[in-house]
Amino acid sequence: MLTVKEKGILLYIIEHCQRIEEKIVGATRKTLDENKDVLEIICFNILQIGELAKKLETDFIKKHNKMPWSDIKGMRDIVAHGYGTINLDKVWKTASEEVKSLREYCESIIEENK
């Protein structure tokens, strides 16, 4: 059973994933070079996802270990402390390939714990 805190965190992670997914519809990797607003929105939501992941307890992470939670937290640190040196290829890969699986995994955890 999920705690209220865990469910809340997962719901917020899902929300931030959806924001990224909505923002990249019709976008390409090149969009990140050409549209700083899109880049900033994606990075902000990646940062928020990482912050939320850091609030998950060790027991939760051990139980729900099909997602690389430490990498998610690490990506937050890269975005937060990149100081203009963020690898845009990595940001694009995260946004276009990894965010959907994170959202689906979080949704499945909530569904399994109804």
How should these model regions be labeled?
Residues 1-114:
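Solvent-exposed interaction patches of small proteins and small membrane subunits
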